[in-house]
């Protein structure tokens, strides 16, 4: 008879096998039938605010970052939303409008990652901490937004997610529930669990190459991804404006503007395929 610990271990192994199979049936890291495709590496890319800064999206932690106008507690926590939902909605409405300005466009780094996905197909996964849609506009489709998406809202009661490009007003409600509920930004706030973590950790365990771009290394769990990838044998690469807080964890490092170092590295990688 299995002990309680044995039952837990058995259940964990079954869940892990089930999740691995589900991932293989999804959009990334699925083995191909064609022999040539089997030789291509599985590449997992993590992007942070640094990749979008050159497109005009202001970063959180730079000297001129958004947090200077508002306290984090006021605009990026569930408690802040409960205290003053109109302030929080106004904050994200302004960011949503900025994202849709014609001058905000994907830069060369975004385009290079779309090119890399074109070459690797479902052996490529992009995990982003950014809530903008510049990766999708550049052409990437295998994307997990672990911190949510600015152009979406969700019902504060049921969690149903809706596409949303305009401002959110106090009168806007979700009608999916018996009683219309307020909408909130589809953004992961401080103290909330990032999205897609099961898929991300499984992908980290399967990756041959892990690349971090434009990340500070301050925010967990993303800052720990390089260590997780290394544990499973992945080659690790940092492409950043300057060394991140976890830069010493990476085997290969290139520093400079994302629009310069990312295309250069992608070309180097593609030549080796």
From Swiss-Prot:
The keyword DNA-binding does not apply. Its cofactor is Zn(2+). It is an enzyme of class 2 (transferase). The active site is at residue 147. It is found in: Cytoplasm. Its EC number is 2.3.1.286. Its main location: cytoplasm. GO terms for cellular component: cytoplasm. It holds the Pfam family SIR2. Residues 20-272 form the Deacetylase sirtuin-type domain. Belongs to the sirtuin family. Class III subfamily. 2 residues (Tyr-92 and Arg-95) present in a large hydrophobic pocket are probably involved in substrate specificity. They are important for desuccinylation activity, but dispensable for deacetylation activity. This is NAD-dependent protein deacylase.
